[in-house]
């Protein structure tokens, strides 16, 4: 059984990330270079071209916000995570997979990110898998690289929906 209203299509599934889209620091509004991300630091990023005065800003930032963390490459346990990173810099959705709260707490020594709403904890050195709390699955990772000018860029969109579970996730 389902509601007879229109299906959302791919609107819930896709974000503004696409191949070549620059990662922009949310605090400075400047494109990020690998040298801007120190080992053990947490930086928040958004796609280039997303402006606060845009009509759909809140909707788009809720799906596209990233946590950028630089880990020592030998501390990354998940093979895909390492392949999708650049020199140990990983990009994960900032949106908790439990109820969609923004994750903002990071513990350098353990590489754990904590959602302040219900304490779901994710191991960012192991594919952002859930290690504690009510979140049902890992944070989606965005594949990143560096363009010819030396800026961090997306190599596509997330390969799975961002945020909490919804009708399409199975």
Curated annotation (Swiss-Prot):
This is Cytochrome bc1 complex Rieske iron-sulfur subunit. It is a multi-pass membrane protein. The keyword Zinc-finger does not apply. Its cofactor is [2Fe-2S] cluster. Residues 63-153 form the Rieske domain. The cytochrome bc1 complex is composed of a cytochrome b (QcrB), the Rieske iron-sulfur protein (QcrA) and a diheme cytochrome c (QcrC) subunit. CDD domains: Rieske. It comes from Streptomyces lividans. GO terms for molecular function: 2 iron, 2 sulfur cluster binding; metal ion binding; monooxygenase activity; oxidoreductase activity, acting on paired donors, with incorporation or reduction of molecular oxygen. [2Fe-2S] cluster binds at residues 96, 98, 115, 118. Binds 1 [2Fe-2S] cluster per subunit.
